[in-house]
């Protein structure tokens, strides 16, 4: 069995991150995880990448900070996959998993002005898996009057380690009501808080394409509060 963290933020790419990518690599390797999926904040979120950069340069800048961490991860036998978390307004976000490259993103500057329906359509055209992140999280920056979008996504993050228990319960109910695929992610921003969430596959996942395919297959278990269920 192969455990993967599905939701984390490093300080090089997300302003809210407090640990560097290499620190996460070390922590998850020590915990025995097979891999981690970086889901840092994209263009409309709390990104550390300058919005003043030209589009193509900005897309490449989003990926560059991971290169050193990927080399370190290879030494430790840990898979590192680069995906993203996309904010679409009112504090709402989706997690996107797949073969996401700076070349694909750089070729489509229209992404920046897409509404969420068109953005998810673009993701699906590329074979990417889209999950609603923490759909019932209560924070000052989130407009709770704006409902989730189960009709557009492929899955729901039913367990987020930093959500209240009732928020995760409601997310699970939403997922079941719409017959969507359940995923789990810690949403950690610090390498000292790791291993409490994720998914467990029955095979090694080495890249974004394999990850999206495995998620669509829906043949995996979840890590919830540190336990495989």
Language-model features: locations:
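Charged catalytic cores and adjacent phosphate/nucleic-acid-binding surfaces used
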Residues: 1-14, 20-26, 90-103, 121, ...
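An N-terminally biased module of ancient metal coordination in phosphate/nucleic-acid-related enzymes
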Residues: 1-88, 149-151, 169, 190-192, ...
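Surface-exposed amphipathic alpha-helices with a cationic face
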Residues: 3, 29, 70-74, 117-131, ...
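Conserved beta-strand positions in the central sheet of alpha/beta enzyme cores
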Residues: 36-38, 131-132, 157
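Flexible loop residues that form catalytic
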Residues: 41, 135, 161
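Glycine/small-residue-rich loop that forms an oxyanion/phosphate-binding "nest" at active or ligand-binding sites
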Residues: 82, 103-106
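Internal catalytic-core helix/loop-beta-alpha segment
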Residues: 108-142
């Amino acid at each position: 069995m192969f455990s993967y963290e599905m939701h984390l933020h490093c300080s090089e790419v997300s302003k809210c991150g407090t640990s560097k990518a290499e620190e996460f690599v070390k922590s998850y390797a020590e915990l025995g995880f097979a891999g981690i999926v970086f889901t840092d904040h994209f263009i409309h979120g709390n990104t550390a990448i300058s919005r003043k950069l030209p589009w193509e340069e900005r897309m490449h800048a989003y990926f560059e900070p991971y290169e050193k961490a990927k080399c370190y991860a290879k030494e430790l036998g840990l898979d590192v996959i680069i995906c993203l978390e996309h904010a679409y307004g009112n504090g709402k976000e989706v997690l996107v998993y797949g073969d996401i490259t700076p070349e694909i993103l750089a070729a489509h500057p229209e992404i920046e002005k897409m509404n969420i329906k068109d953005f998810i359509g673009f993701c699906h055209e590329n074979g990417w898996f889209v999950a609603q992140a923490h759909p019932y999280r209560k924070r000052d920056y989130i407009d709770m009057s704006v409902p989730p979008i189960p009709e557009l996504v492929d899955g729901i993050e039913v367990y987020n380690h930093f959500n209240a228990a009732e928020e995760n319960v409601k997310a699970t109910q939403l997922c079941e009501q719409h017959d969507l695929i359940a995923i789990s992610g810690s949403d950690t921003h610090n390498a000292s808080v790791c291993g409490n969430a994720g998914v467990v596959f029955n095979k090694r996942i080495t890249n974004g394409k394999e990850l999206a395919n495995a998620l669509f297959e829906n043949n995996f278990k979840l890590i919830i509060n540190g336990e495989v269920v």
